[in-house]
């Protein structure tokens, strides 16, 4: 078992889910990690933990979304855990920094939500964080995104799916 696996197991064990649906996912994720020593890695065929972060600029009331090149959807930043990731939060912060080009992002201390979804590669057991951007932060598009854009809170429901809207609602409640 890797250090990242141990950290992900601890995070899921200690996380206080905000409702019954999230608690059921928390238990399912924890069980998956108990059953799969490789459950944090892309190679785990039955599904794997991923880490994402919704980049928020609370001073401007906006969030940064990336237009995923392969899926064609406006999403929060995030992706697969990598061997150099020591913690789940570190993986989420790395992904957010790489995909947004914004330095000085700061994660809220615990996950905001969990979201399980099927992708072309496997089932993703996504652990979602909120990342606070410095006021006036400027994003720089990466090769992983077709586009990168700031949206006012009230615009998100018109461009993103329900999972992103729920992540925004939960993240704002944690601010």
What is each PLM-predicted segment?
Residues 1-8, 171-175:
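Actinobacteria-biased recognition of intrinsically disordered, low-complexity terminal regions
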Residues 55, 130-132, 152:
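Short, well-ordered beta-strand micro-motif
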Residues 59-97, 102, 154:
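Conserved Nudix-box catalytic region and its N-terminal flanking loop in Nudix hydrolases
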């Amino acid at each position: 078992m890797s250090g990242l696996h141990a950290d992900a197991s601890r995070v899921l064990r200690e996380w206080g889910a905000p409702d019954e649906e999230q608690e059921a996912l928390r238990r399912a994720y924890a069980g998956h990690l108990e059953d799969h020593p490789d459950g944090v890695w892309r190679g785990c065929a039955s599904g794997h933990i991923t880490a994402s972060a919704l980049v928020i600029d609370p001073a401007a009331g906006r969030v940064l979304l990336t237009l995923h090149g392969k899926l064609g959807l406006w999403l929060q930043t995030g992706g697969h855990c990598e061997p150099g990731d020591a913690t789940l939060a570190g993986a989420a912060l790395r992904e957010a920094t790489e995909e947004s080009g914004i330095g000085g992002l700061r994660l809220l201390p615990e996950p905001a939500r969990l979201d399980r979804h099927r992708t072309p590669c496997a089932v993703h057991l996504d652990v979602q964080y909120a990342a606070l951007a410095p006021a006036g932060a400027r994003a720089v598009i990466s090769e992983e995104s077709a586009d990168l854009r700031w949206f006012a809170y009230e615009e998100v429901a018109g461009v993103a799916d329900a999972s992103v809207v729920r992540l925004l609602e939960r993240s704002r409640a944690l601010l």
